[in-house]
Amino acid sequence: MTTLLNPYFGEFGGMYVPQILMPALRQLEEAFVSAQKDPEFQAQFNDLLKNYAGRPTALTKCQNITAGTNTTLYLKREDLLHGGAHKTNQVLGQALLAKRMGKTKIIAETGAGQHGVASALASALLGLKCRIYMGAKDVERQSPNVFRMRLMGAEVIPVHSGSATLKDACNEALRDWSGSYETAHYMLGTAAGPHPYPTIVREFQRMIGEETKAQILEREGRLPDAVIACVGGGSNAIGMFADFINETDVGLIGVEPGGHGIETGEHGAPLKHGRVGIYFGMKAPMMQTEDGQIEESYSISAGLDFPSVGPQHAYLNSTGRADYVSITDDEALEAFKTLCLHEGIIPALESSHALAHALKMMRENPEKEQLLVVNLSGRGDKDIFTVHDILKARGEI
């Protein structure tokens, strides 16, 4: 099938979906390309971002955790966005696209529940019905977000198959969409999946990096040495990276979930520890068994518990433009506690992975003068019960 936009990033990406979904993806690409050129669509999107979601978000300088070092650390505060995370940005764009295509229903998948909440709020705002698939394990560990979705009128369907986590929710959502795409739009929640989703999600998240660039120049008079973001599927990271890719003096650092440790096999770090395969409609690195079956990923944070990664991240990794590292559950938890105790900010466990790597960079070289920006992709209200249970089991509270 010929496409309007390049469906690949190097060798990664593509449209590996059943033939029945090709017309839906073609229609979506056409709607997106025309919307990008339509000043009225852009004005409506920007108005929602500003007056509904609360953009631009703040760039906060850490006051205390850098004490005794020469590091200057800023946080891009996506946690302050309506809905509690960066997810709200791109769902508003996709919901407007759904209306533009004449769709009446939204189908979505969610892990931590943040994309589900964002999908539910956008659907409520724009008068769309909303059905959300969520792994049964995630329904259990993210009950506050499940109730938020239901309060806003969404139907939440627990998925018990497979590992009962995000990858299984993705499979069920795609299955539903293949039978209902004439009236429903599949609101994919990350910068992964079949073309054109990785491109659409990047473009509807790129204001994160655009704002960061303008804000850091205003505050510091120069660009940062590195921007750091957590990577599950990779939408918050690609939103931060997009406007810096051509700024070759700015390091791009993506942080994958190391779970219980890479050596245990219980992690979610396919970029550095997976093999290229085809899954979820795309060619990308993924966690696979010896015989090529998709392996279960693991992370303390439901939103990073995904066995693959967006194709543009795979490309940035293959070219060396971005560096990808991993942070364990324990390291993320320590960073979570540090930010709470010393800056009065409760971060999402996902974002805590990025913060943990920034703290590691700072502590490993305290004399080094460096200007770092962490994308604080979401707030940690949803995670307080998970953290409470872990700390209680350890006897720390």
From Swiss-Prot:
Name under which the protein is recorded: Tryptophan synthase beta chain
InterPro entries per UniProt: Trp_synth_b_CS, Trp_synth_beta, Trp_synth_beta/beta-like, TrpB-like_PALP, TrpB-like_PALP_sf
Stated family: Belongs to the TrpB family.
Its biological purpose: The beta subunit is responsible for the synthesis of L-tryptophan from indole and L-serine.
The keyword Oxidoreductase is annotated on this UniProt entry: no
Keywords: Amino-acid biosynthesis, Aromatic amino acid biosynthesis, Lyase, Pyridoxal phosphate, Tryptophan biosynthesis
Catalytic activity entry: (1S,2R)-1-C-(indol-3-yl)glycerol 3-phosphate + L-serine = D-glyceraldehyde 3-phosphate + L-tryptophan + H2O
Name of the gene encoding the protein in the UniProt record: trpB
